[in-house]
């Protein structure tokens, strides 16, 4: 039987055809979160060691923070305020030795220590976002897994389907930083040699040098709740950049039935990200189109948006037009975007084996 790859979007469409609406949910599968008729917003995100976080360079406290940021960002991407977090935690039978890079000798963590570190990280983000851990479940299994369910509330939700022809496309913050930081940390963890030189010929330690902003954006993304209050009345279509600019902008085009044209020269890229790409001989534009997990807000509006709101950069990066598909304008040429971002199923075939 031939191997047929199945995308995450393809699997979602299959699930949508299987499950039936019974009128209890205002908006179900297909957006950043589900929406009930009373304005309650619900999302859930699963995270697995090795796939979504790497214990070779992260502490469990950092894992908890990062997972909480990712899940809460989906609530913010519905223009809602987070309220409660439920944590389902699968702990490995064996003791963990996370993040040997942050200490000279790896420290074996008991189950109690694992729980303390993970939950302290999650609760730290909850404190910043004004929500709280309200329960969950804990089991013991072979690998470390977390699933976070977050609820929130909104009177004026925003959807991926809200973009309109004539709108302008905006994004908060910077693009590509988190993925660049992940690669920097992964390379450093693989080297395991203090002061080893990387591909750029400079000292490998990411601490205290130009890579630090990238590392920080990977380890500690920030859900953009702080600016949502001011942005909400201005927004038409909304999504967060969890899967990468190309994938998430394409979601806006498909759900809204519009054409989006990105302006290549307008994309906000940190100098450190540009330097990271230059060191590797890669094109910064191609990199940021596919780089995910920045958790910035990607939105459309017909109103002018200030370039800075509550200390967060907001950049005009494109336009919404009549038509279909995602396009990019670069050097006097407009072409379709073929790059894609993160897909959970990209290495899985239809029979469950790795392609």
Question: Where are the regions that the model predicts?
Answer:
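N-terminal glycine-rich phosphate/pyrophosphate-binding loops that anchor nucleotide-derived ligands
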Residues: 1-76, 337-340
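Short coil/turn connectors at secondary-structure junctions
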Residues: 22-23, 30-31, 37-39, 80-83, ...
